[in-house]
Amino acid sequence: MMKRSFSIFTSVFLMMSILLLTACAGDQDSGGGDGKGEITFYSPETPDMTKELGQKFEELHDGSVNVQYAGTNVLVNRMMAEKDNPQGDVWYGGGGILPFEAAVDKGIVGKYIPDFAKDWDTVEDGIKVKHEDGKYVGVEVFVLGFAYNTDLVKADEAPKTWDDLLDPKWKGKIQFSNPAASGTATLMVLNQMMQRGEAEGWDYFKKLVDQANSMPDSGSAPTKAVSMGEAHIGVGFDFMAYEQKAKGESVDFVVPDKTPILVNPVSIVEGGPNPEGGKKLIDFLLSKEGQQILANWYHIPINPDVESKTPLTLEKVKSHAVDLDIDWVNENYDRVRNEWKEKFQ
């Protein structure tokens, strides 16, 4: 009788132990119930800056941040490949909203708008600051324009419009990144197509390619080339130039008369393993602490309580903004990139 009781007790104990271990393992694997655990953070933005954002979040909140850095198009392709078993939780950055808009119908971004941005209109001052269905929200403002080397170009001689780049005096002195690889350059191409029409747009880029001495794959490379004197003019975002200037390089920036001014967004990854942690990370990016890090890297913060460290603010640049036809972008994003490859590579 005693042996039988011992046997039953042992069986019940073992069963309870197995159930407990299984439950614990499930909690550790998901990390999604309370936001604790690892948060996988996909970003093409400056690796050191993105790492700093992750570290600051870890200081302030539970959970660890695993930063996964790659180019925008590489990350989008990765999320598409992982669609049936998502590995990321948050996707931040891609040279503005266009890659995010193109990704909405791909089923790789989920719906989440932080409380901080819930009262924003979808479009503020002519700039789309969040997705109408909550698929992304802007965390900073990017201005596409011209970096120039102040030792090689006088301020009053620097180009002020996109047509100025075709001036013969800049032949062999301009760099812009490769639209087949760079989200920054894709924005440049799509904008010109929308403003000029496709026939005139392709003619414009045929001339611009002849002006360039290089088309590197990285969106930041033309500005770095300007800082080293390898180019007089480089097409890029504002923060790229001001970051170089802050390092003591001979670089300044021109906001063209009419140019893309857009937010750089963040999205929750659809079906990611730690959605609650991902939401907390997005909240952090819009908080004063997160926005201050972006400002320290010379990005224009979207939170009005954080001061820009560059001469530019949303208020100062909004009059330069062009109207971007987002529906046209969604319909033509991949096609225009492929046509660029066929025409110029």
Regions found by a protein language model. Name each.
Residues A25-G26, G33-E101:
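Early extracytoplasmic/lumenal segment of secretory-pathway proteins
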Residues M1-I39:
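Short, low-complexity disordered leader/linker segments with a strong preference
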Residues G145-L152, L190, V263-P275, L285, ...:
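A bilobed periplasmic-binding-protein/Venus flytrap-type ligand-binding module shared by bacterial periplasmic
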Residues F142, G172-S177, Y204-V209, M215-P216, K247-E270, L285-S308, ...:
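Periplasmic-binding protein-like
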Residues S43-K51, A70, Q87-E230:
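Extracytoplasmic ligand-binding site segments that recognize negatively charged/polar headgroups
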Residues P311-Q345:
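Extracellular/periplasmic bilobal clamshell ligand-binding domains
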Residues I97-A102, S227, A231-S250:
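A ligand-binding cleft/hinge motif common to bilobed small-molecule-binding domains
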